[in-house]
């Protein structure tokens, strides 16, 4: 039986003798044995049926050091194990404040095993006690008791307690999330099913066949450890599956599955870019000699003080004991008798146990992960090894052992043809005027080895060099005797010279004496000669344009000093040009012998050497090409990219949205507002972009299914009579469709969260239990804010058997947006607008008597529900999560809810378990007490300036992972410091001591890091971290190479998801060692070694580049793993050549796989400060148009406004293209003018910053967005923003001294109030000018001065709209409007007794012109408003009679419409006043 692991959790259930085997000497079932853990796995089989599997007899366990207390007890091992077991039960009973005599047993078994400590180099096995428990809940409690010394009065170090129960199970049995689990025939099916799944089984862990793919690697049998795995094998099973899948896709399959992997593996190694003929050297550190001396002295002193110098080395003192790996799969749990130990004999610290309840609780971790070894043979595949899939794409597909005569001959673009023969089936070379020249190529240096350390075999490759113009058919063409020549010929049409001659390449003209001609005695210099002279004289090849002013009036009359540098403004007129330096002398030779030019004239033309083809020739050529394509089609078919789709990837997903009818336009409240309609969308396969079914359930007593069905023929419509029926129908729909994933755009305050809260409050209904896949469960719940971590990171809704996705929160990690509303996400992903209706408008549509308006609401909600699934599909969110779960080995939900350390451990444990390594589990106190991190990466402070010369960006690829691999760094290879301080050797959170005899034997195979720590080299013990990272990096390179020739969107999504998962794990491995606050197994010394080594590598590279003379390169900035190198006077083409040369030279100076990659050039660019730069990016020589790229500045930051981003980017682009400050000034002043004139959309002024209301102690210290949200919540409590939600707000003008928080308003508040005005001065002076001035000040210019000197537009006053009750807002504008003429807005009104007048005397004298003006303005605004309404109706797919209710904050048309609507109302009031004043 086989099915995928889509969902996994556990629960405690009563012991059932039919399934559970708890061990020997336990009370019988009649005595009510304690509950036992049962793991529940939900998945899909190949027939897409849902499967529920209950796995019994899997118990959580921890390890403790046997040597910590065993030697102090005068007991035999069985007796000691019994006493320890009884002591643990007694201590747990006291900690639980229960009676020890009646407390149910908590320990399932205690077993003595052996393993290799992972934390620090250890060469021999040590004893450990494996303690299995009945409940995972007791594990953390027991760990605390051990650490406090409450058991046997001994403080004991605990091992592997930080590995959660489910992850422990998945690692032990080689299981991976979203990957198949294989079961044997020993499965049990019962009649009374516990779930709603199609298939339900009960199994024991022995039935899981995945564990059979693992095998123990006995590598700890010698001082110089052997590698038990095959050279081509992978230690992580999930990575081996990726290689097999890619081999199948590239058609490298064979009858033997392992051969397919081997072919691809050898192909990948042949394509490794760091392969070279010469071995790469290892750079010596500055303090290396001193460190080696310290190590020698340390060994000498320890040997002198040691008494067991001649003690023989024993690597396995207890061969009879099971290893930790073999103990995992022991079927019979050996349980010592506990009848002989009385309670009075137990040594337990009761004070510690009874006070346990006062200790801080440690949250249980319930997650999982996986890894495996596969062994493969090495095949002979020279073609794929050398060529891969990307070279010689224009050639017919060639493979080893294929008859070359089957392929048609065709002319080559190149003058050479490469033919590669397999070493086993090399045919005799064809007859050719040139002989085959064998050439041995070794693409691997001695330092580059495959898995296991075996060197890669050399192969012979034969190259056949044919003639340049070889025949184009299979038979030799004897009639073609043309020689190679130029494509064009040159002739002169003279009276006596009409012959056109073909010029061979080696032709040199020899003029006869009777012809009058001039030949230079000295040939002109070639381009190479000129370049050489320029290099010698240090003349720049390119002189960049300096920053200047194109307009004389813009040039300031003074110089500006900034950062200690004086800037003198320059223009483009002649007075700014440097004077020409010359003494006016003329060469004597030129003066006496002037050059005489020939009076020889003639007409010159160019003619093609070969005439144009005739139509007949073209038709013959087409027929030949057609035949050629028919011949090549089988080969092309064999090269087609076939990707076998995962049969378990068809995960079903259900999206749900609700409409609730609230009062007063408030956000729906589940305690008050009933659910009127439920909308759903269903997708059978998340990999498909098609939505299979949509529908809705509506509460309407007066309507029927047919009335709604006629309007929505493509939807599944169901009309119910009550809200309770609606909830029951949702439950029925959920069970019928049986989705693995349920989702909503926001699932806490709406969607599933609202549905659950409403059912609980109104009907006292436990909806999560009904929605689960189990008939009865206690783990389904909606804790909301009780589980703070899930509430703020994923979803706090727990439905057993199904995953709940909170889409908007997942999108925060996928796309960088200023606002994560559904409308803005759709706009940025699909590039189209979607309407937004507020709650009041939705209620209005629902309560309308017109069914058509109800239909508008239903269509609106259905579209929003569809978008939930379309967004998931477009961003490939589910595919990314599933691929990451399959690679890392954790369950689906842990991918988005757990941190990087949890994911690293999943892979580390999978490699460590078969090698019998055992990991310590530090307490929070131990982590805090380890040595502080000392090393810092090298981050230079750049010289802030504009760099007009090309700046080459060099980046060390995966520097920290490469350092770990190159220098064999790991916990298990660290010997400790070479210098001991205070006689103590502390490694991370533990004290570590190395055997001086062992260190003395391997002293020549030790690497000493720059921070003074010693590590054994690879030939002694291969670093486990290096093993893991090698496989991750090699697999990612292979996947990325496969993406280049992938033409399927689905396959590209899968491959991209895989390489992202691999990249994530490789990049966070260093962080796992350096997590000094929340670390699960940190080691500050190893982290310092990695950082210090990286610092030394970057420092050496910096010094090497700065000392070069041939290119005058200068490092202007460096950051951790990258270098910015300025090349003065170089052209763009030269910059690419020099950059590649620098990268190759530096790469050769460090051991593999450390590689410096030439990434790009910036030309030109600004360097502002650390991690803040911007420039025009070029990634290839052929790239014509530059790409604007910025890091750390306002154009990419999200704490500003869109208008700020747009202005800064526009000015920088102009500056980079023209170097003209006058043009930049004009653009800046134009934008400021448009802003002050009110021509910039209001949405471009919105700030959108994250709000976390629970984090602010006082409202007075909260940011403006939080203050505004609090103010809105006083009116609408359910409008509370989600944790981390970006809340948009505007800054309006107010009285001087008003705080920014009190001037912040929501966009809808601003638009609904015609008297509010944006604080334009704040936006210009505080938002636009400062970021721009940071660049302009470097050039001697100032945007602040440009703004002060520009003319400011006068804004005309607009009559403010009256509010209810006729009361107007008494702003300065309204006061002036009361005194000014409503028509001309210039003169004061004419006061007429006993009459209300709003016109001045001039306008009263000319009533026709006054009325005409008022009517014209009124009609103009109405016409514009009508046009905007038509645009909105078209976007919302409404008819001309439908109301436009859209209020999308992501649409510029909405802001324009709202502004025009306000102006239209103002003009209507002005027209009414004007007509009233004229008695109309």
Curated annotation (Swiss-Prot):
Location relative to the cell: Mitochondrion; Nucleus
Motif annotated as CysB motif, chain positions: 1432-1451
Keywords attached to this entry: 4Fe-4S, DNA damage, DNA repair, DNA replication, DNA-binding, DNA-directed DNA polymerase, Iron, Iron-sulfur, Metal-binding, Mitochondrion, Nucleotidyltransferase, Nucleus, Transferase, Zinc, Zinc-finger
Pfam families hit by this protein: DNA_pol_B (PF00136), DNA_pol_B_exo1 (PF03104), POL3_N (PF24055), zf-C4pol (PF14260)
Entry superkingdom: Eukaryota
Similarity annotation: Belongs to the DNA polymerase type-B family.
Protein name, UniProt field: DNA polymerase zeta catalytic subunit
Species in which this protein is naturally found: Schizosaccharomyces pombe (strain 972 / ATCC 24843)
Gene from which the chain derives: rev3
């Amino acid at each position: 039986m086989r099915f995928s692991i889509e969902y996994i959790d556990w629960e405690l259930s009563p012991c059932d003798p039919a399934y559970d085997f708890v061990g020997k000497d336990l009370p019988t079932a009649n005595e009510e044995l304690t509950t036992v853990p049962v793991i529940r796995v939900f998945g899909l089989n190949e027939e897409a049926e849902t499967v529920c599997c209950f796995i019994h007899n899997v118990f959580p366990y921890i390890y403790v050091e046997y040597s910590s207390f065993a030697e102090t007890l005068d007991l035999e091992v069985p007796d000691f194990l019994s006493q320890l077991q009884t002591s643990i039960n007694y201590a747990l009973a006291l900690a639980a404040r229960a009676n020890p005599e009646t407390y149910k047993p908590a320990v399932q078994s205690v077993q003595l095993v052996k393993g290799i400590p992972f934390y620090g180099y250890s060469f021999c096995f040590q004893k450990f006690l494996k303690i299995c428990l009945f409940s995972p809940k007791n594990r953390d409690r027991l760990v605390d008791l051990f650490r406090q010394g409450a058991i046997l009065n001994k403080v004991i170090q605990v091992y592997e307690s930080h590995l959660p129960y489910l992850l422990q199970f998945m690692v032990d049995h080689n299981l991976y999330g979203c990957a198949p689990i294989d079961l044997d025939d020993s499965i049990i099916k019962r009649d009374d099913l516990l779930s709603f799944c199609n298939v339900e089984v009960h199994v024991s862990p022995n039935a899981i066949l995945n564990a059979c793919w693992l095998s123990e690697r006995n590598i700890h049998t010698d001082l110089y450890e052997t590698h038990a795995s095959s050279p081509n094998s992978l230690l992580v099973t999930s990575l081996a599956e990726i290689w097999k899948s890619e081999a199948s896709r590239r058609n490298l399959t064979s009858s033997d599955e392992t051969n397919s992997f081997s072919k691809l593996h050898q192909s990948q190694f042949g394509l490794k870019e760091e392969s070279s003929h010469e071995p790469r050297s290892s750079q010596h550190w500055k303090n290396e000699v001193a460190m080696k001396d310290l190590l020698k002295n340390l060994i000498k002193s320890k040997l002198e003080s040691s008494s067991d110098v001649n003690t023989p080395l024993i690597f396995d003192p207890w061969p009879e004991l099971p290893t930790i790996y073999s103990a995992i799969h022991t079927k019979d749990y050996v349980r010592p008798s506990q009848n002989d130990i009385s309670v009075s004999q137990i040594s337990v610290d009761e004070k510690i146990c009874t006070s346990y309840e006062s200790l801080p609780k440690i949250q249980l971790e319930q997650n999982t992960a996986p890894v495996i070894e596969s062994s493969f043979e090495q095949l002979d595949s020279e073609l794929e090894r050398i060529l891969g899939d990307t070279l010689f794409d224009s050639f017919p597909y060639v493979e080893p052992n294929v008859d070359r005569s089957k392929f048609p001959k065709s002319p080559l673009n190149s003058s050479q043809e490469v033919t590669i023969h397999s070493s086993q089936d090399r045919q005799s070379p064809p007859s050719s005027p040139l002989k085959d020249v064998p050439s041995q190529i070794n693409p691997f240096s001695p330092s580059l080895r495959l898995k296991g350390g075996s060197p890669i075999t050399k192969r012979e490759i034969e190259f056949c060099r044919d003639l340049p113009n070889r025949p184009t058919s299979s038979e030799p063409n004897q009639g073609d005797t043309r020689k190679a020549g130029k494509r064009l010929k040159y002739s002169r049409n003279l009276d006596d010279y009409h012959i056109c001659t073909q010029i061979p390449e080696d032709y040199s003209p020899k003029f006869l004496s009777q012809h009058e001609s001039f030949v230079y005695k000295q040939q002109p210099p070639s381009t190479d000669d000129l370049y050489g002279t320029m290099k010698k004289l240090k003349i720049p090849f390119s002189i960049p344009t300096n920053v200047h002013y194109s307009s004389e009036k813009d040039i300031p009359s003074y110089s500006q000093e900034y950062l200690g540098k004086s800037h003198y403004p320059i223009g483009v007129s002649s007075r700014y040009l440097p004077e020409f330096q010359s003494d006016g002398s003329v060469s004597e030779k030129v003066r006496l012998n002037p050059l005489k030019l020939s009076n020889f004239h003639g007409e010159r033309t160019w003619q093609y050497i070969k005439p144009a083809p005739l139509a007949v020739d073209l038709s013959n050529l087409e027929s030949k090409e057609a035949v050629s394509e028919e011949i090549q089609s089988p080969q092309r078919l064999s090269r087609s990219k076939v990707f076998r789709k995962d049969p378990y990837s068809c995960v079903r997903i259900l999206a749900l949205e609700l409409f609730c009818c609230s009062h007063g336009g408030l956000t729906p409240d589940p305690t008050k507002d009933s659910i009127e309609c439920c909308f759903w969308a269903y997708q059978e396969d998340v990999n498909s972009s098609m939505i299979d079914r949509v529908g809705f359930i509506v509460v309407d007593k007066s309507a029927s299914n047919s009335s709604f069905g006629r309007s929505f023929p493509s939807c599944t419509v169901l009309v119910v009579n009550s809200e309770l029926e609606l909830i029951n129908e949702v439950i029925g729909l959920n069970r019928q469709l049986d989705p693995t994933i349920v989702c909503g755009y926001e699932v806490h305050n709406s969607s599933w969260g609202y549905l659950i809260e409403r059912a609980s409050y109104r009907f006292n209904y436990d909806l999560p239990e009904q929605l689960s896949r189990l008939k009865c469960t206690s783990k389904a719940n909606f804790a909301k804010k009780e589980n703070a971590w899930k509430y703020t990171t994923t979803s706090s809704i727990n439905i057993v058997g199904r995953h709940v996705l909170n889409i908007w929160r997942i999108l925060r990690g996928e796309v960088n947006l200023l606002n994560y509303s559904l409308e803005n996400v759709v706009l940025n992903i699909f590039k189209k607008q979607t309407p937004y209706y507020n709650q009041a408008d939705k209620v209005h549509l629902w309560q309308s008597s017109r069914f058509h308006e109800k239909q508008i609401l239903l269509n609106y909600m259905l579209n929003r529900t569809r978008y939930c699934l379309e967004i998931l599909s477009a961003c490939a969110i589910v595919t990314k999560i599933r691929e990451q779960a399959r690679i890392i080995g954790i369950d689906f939900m842990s991918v988005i809810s757990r941190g990087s350390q949890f994911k690293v451990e999943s892979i580390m444990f999978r490699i460590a378990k078969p090698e019998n390594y055992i990991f310590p589990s530090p307490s929070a106190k131990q982590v805090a007490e380890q040595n502080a991190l000392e090393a810092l990466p090298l981050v230079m402070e750049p010289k802030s300036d504009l760099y007009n010369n090309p700046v080459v960006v060099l980046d060390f690829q995966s520097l920290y992972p490469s350092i770990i691999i190159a220098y064999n760094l790991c916990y298990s290879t660290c010997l400790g410091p070479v210098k001991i301080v205070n006689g103590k050797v502390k490694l991370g959170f533990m004290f570590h001591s190395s055997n001086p005899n062992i260190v003395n034997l391997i002293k020549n195979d030790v690497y000493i890091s720059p921070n003074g720590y010693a590590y054994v080299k690879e030939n002694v013990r291969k670093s486990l971290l290096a093993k893991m990272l090698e496989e991750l990096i090699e697999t990612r390179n292979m996947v990325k190479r496969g993406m280049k020739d992938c033409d399927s969107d689905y396959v590209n999504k899968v491959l991209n998801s895989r390489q992202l998962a691999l990249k994530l794990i490789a990049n966070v491995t260093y962080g796992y060692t350096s997590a000094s606050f929340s670390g699960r197994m940190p080691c500050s010394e190893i982290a310092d070694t990695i950082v210090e080594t990286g610092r030394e590598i970057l420092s050496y590279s910096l010094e090497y580049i700065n000392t070069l003379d041939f290119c005058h390169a200068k490092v202007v900035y460096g950051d951790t793993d990258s270098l910015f190198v300025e090349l003065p006077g170089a052209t763009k083409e030269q910059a690419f050549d020099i950059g590649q040369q620098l990268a190759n030279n530096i790469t050769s100076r460090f051991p593999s796989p450390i590689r410096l990659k030439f990434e790009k050039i910036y030309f030109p660019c600004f360097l502002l400060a650390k991690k803040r730069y911007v420039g025009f990016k070029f990634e290839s020589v052929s790239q014509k148009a530059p790409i604007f790229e910025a890091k750390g500045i306002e154009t990419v930051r999200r704490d500003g406004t869109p208008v700020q981003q747009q202005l800064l980017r526009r000015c920088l682009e102009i500056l980079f293209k023209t170097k003209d400050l006058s043009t930049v000034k004009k653009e800046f002043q134009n934008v400021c003018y448009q802003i002050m004139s009110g021509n910039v959309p209001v949405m471009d002024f919105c700030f959108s910053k994250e709000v976390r209301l629970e984090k602010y102690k006082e409202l007075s210290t909260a940011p403006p967005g939080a203050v505004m949200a609090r103010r809105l919540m006083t009116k609408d409590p359910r409008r509370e923003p989600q944790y981390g939600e970006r809340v948009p707000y505007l800054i309006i003008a107010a009285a001087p001294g008003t705080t920014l928080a009190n001037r912040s308003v929501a966009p809808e508040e601003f638009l609904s109030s015609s008297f509010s005005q944006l604080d334009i001065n704040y936006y210009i002076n505080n938002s636009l000018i400062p970021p721009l001035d940071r660049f302009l000040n470097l050039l001697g210019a100032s945007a602040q001065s440009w703004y002060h000197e520009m003319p400011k537009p006068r804004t005309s006053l607009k009559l403010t709209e009256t509010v209810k009750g006729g009361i107007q807002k008494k702003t300065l504008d309204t006061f002036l409007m009361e005194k000014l003429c409503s028509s001309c807005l210039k003169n004061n009104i004419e006061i007429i007794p006993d009459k209300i007048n709003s016109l001045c005397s001039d306008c009263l004298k000319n009533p026709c012109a006054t009325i005409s003006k008022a009517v014209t303005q009124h009609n103009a605004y109405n016409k514009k408003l009508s046009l905007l309404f038509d645009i909105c109706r078209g976007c919302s797919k409404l008819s001309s009679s439908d109301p436009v209710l859209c209020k999308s904050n992501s649409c510029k048309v909405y802001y324009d419409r709202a502004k025009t609507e306000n102006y239209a109302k103002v003009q209507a009031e002005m027209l009414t006043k004007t007509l009233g004043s004229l008695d109309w």
